[in-house]
From Swiss-Prot:
Matches recorded under PANTHER family: RNA POLYMERASE SIGMA FACTOR RPO, RNA POLYMERASE SIGMA FACTOR RPOD
Subunit structure: Interacts transiently with the RNA polymerase catalytic core.
Protein's name according to its UniProt entry: RNA polymerase sigma factor RpoD
Low complexity bias spans: 29-38, 82-91
Annotated region (Sigma-70 factor domain-2), positions in chain: 474-544
Pfam families associated with the record: Sigma70_ner, Sigma70_r1_1, Sigma70_r1_2, Sigma70_r2, Sigma70_r3, Sigma70_r4
Function according to Swiss-Prot or TrEMBL: Sigma factors are initiation factors that promote the attachment of RNA polymerase to specific initiation sites and are then released. This sigma factor is the primary sigma factor during exponential growth. Also required for extracellular A-signal production. The A-signal is the first in a series of extracellular signals that are required for myxspore differentiation in M.xanthus. It is thought to act as a cell-density signal during early development to ensure there are enough cells present to complete fruiting-body morphogenesis.
TM stretches of this protein: none
UniProt keywords, alphabetically: Cytoplasm, DNA-binding, Fruiting body, Sigma factor, Sporulation, Transcription, Transcription regulation
Molecular-function GO terms, alphabetical: DNA binding; sigma factor activity
Amino acid sequence: MPTQKPSKASVKPTKKKVDPVIRKKKAPDGAAAKGAKTGAEEKEELVARDVVAEATEKLKKKKKGVAPAMGDDVDPEEAAEEAAAAVQVDPDAVEDDIEEDPVAERKEVKDLLAAGREKGFLTYDEVNDALPADIVSSDQIDDVMSMFGDNDIEIVDAQKAAQNNEIKPTVTVEEEKEDADEDEKDEDDEPGGKSNDPVRLYLRKMGSVSLLTREGEVEIAKRIEDGEKEVLRALLACKVAVEEILDIGNKLKTAKLRVRDVIKDAPEETQSEGAEEAPEEVGEGDAPAQLAQSELNKIEQICKQIERFRKFAQDCDVLEEELSSKKKLTEVRKKEVKQEIKDLRTKMMEVLEEMRLNKKQVDRIVINLKALIERVDKAEDELRDLERRYDCSMKELRPQLKESRENPNIGKKLQKQLNLTPEQLEVLDRDVRTAVRKIKKVEEEANLPVESLRRNYDAIRLGERRAERAKSELVEANLRLVVSIAKKYTNRGLQFLDLIQEGNIGLMKAVDKFEYKRGYKFSTYATWWIRQAITRAIADQARTIRIPVHMIETINKLIRTSRYLVQEIGREPTPEEIAEKMELPLDKVRKVLKIAKEPISLETPIGEEEDSHLGDFIEDKSLVSPADAVINMNLAEQTRKVLATLTPREEKVLRMRFGIGEKSDHTLEEVGQDFEVTRERIRQIEAKALRKLRHPSRSKRLRSFVES
């Protein structure tokens, strides 16, 4: 068998015991690296490990002055030789290497010492990775550990180091890319080729996006802000948009709009929903009055800002009228007016930034502008259809049609030119005027020429696209954060992909509301939104019967209290004990316990083979049990035999009176009418028949049914 290279020895000492382990060198690339070890090789490594461990333990005891026990007189150098022999290494070569290259002078050990002095500790993994492969003897390992002790360097687990020093393992972009490439390679090596698992595909795609630094987040946030400012600047150039903004104040005053629908800083709707769902949780204090007063103050502040905006808008309108009037202005005055308009729009922009106008309002205004543009496009499409139909240019045709209304000769010329009858020319003229009228109506509503309106709308769309592109980059770069948070909420009623989807919705909300100027990292801000979106989705969708959010919180609190009491008293707590611990009324605790019950499917498989279902074991109380059915059949048979011993008249009277074999029982009057006798006679016949039935010869057949 060929000689094998020595394996590294990694030492994980504790205060009580030193346990060196043979650390394997990384296998070279190729098929040999992928092959499994033979049983003989594994056995040799285990033998070497035991020998080195025993030698190291003896050395420690010797240094502490502890006399070796019986069977412990093993020399460390002999142990090193045995370990080297176990892995088929020449001990003389090892000794020569040690003499020529002392452990303390090795570059790897020096680097370890430098890193340990800087941090104050080293992890076992760092020591194992850095130690050379030829350090296998207990003396060498002990020398290394002694050097760490002399330099006050503690050897700890990686997990303990992270907890004690609050160190979170960081992964660089390059490492993540390498991991992603390795995962993809592993997936490609699978027997079935690339995996079709949607979670795996999503994670692979997610891993291809680079992480962002704080500077990258700020740069993207600035691009989002610039795009939104472009939209607002384009809106200010449209008078119809300015009028929509001014109308917000009136809608606030008349309560047609709420504060949270107008500005970004208002409380979220989710908070108010919780308040609506749990009215009994609200105390009798002044909180509602304070909220109402706060909203009134906010409305007053917004109205003041809108009044300032109105003043600037009116001044801007006056200057624009002056600029567009037929009155001739000097070039100097024109420049002054244009500069004043620009300054006023800058001030209007500042007011909008102070207001922090909600994106819903901006989107609503943009939608209104889009509706105007669509009306213009529709009218222009009608004109183009007429051009194609009559093979003419509308730019030349419109003046001619206008002249033809006043001059019949021009109309005849047009008829000949277009090969139309007078009626067809009249229809063409009417269609053209209708389309032109639609365009002019839009211009009147927008108070702008169509060209300016379209130019402003294009600027709005450009700003929106830039902002959306930047938002998309910020979202894609933080998808890992969503996955890491969603992992903590698995097995709560929603699938993992659903949790990721809900978390992504929360992430997009966080992107919309992120303010980089406050100095916080985006992940810090987004974590709350992601967690809130996931928990709300679990509360809304995880249960078959939806439970309000405030009740979910109460249920979770009750479950935590119940677990605490189980640990404290050693058994399941009673509702009374839970109510006392939670300081809640007993009725409410019982109600919460009842609500917390989960529905279970009747198709739930039962048994090891799962060949039966839960529904098979549930009693159907709407059906008669087989035992009762047999008893009833026997009772009917015995009753029929007993009645057969009476006279036919007596039998029929009893049957009609007690409803035996009849649809219902009958009164004495009804039976008397059937027999054409009086009620008294029927009563006498009934009494006589019952006396006969009470005779032991007949009653013994029915007595067992009465007793049972």
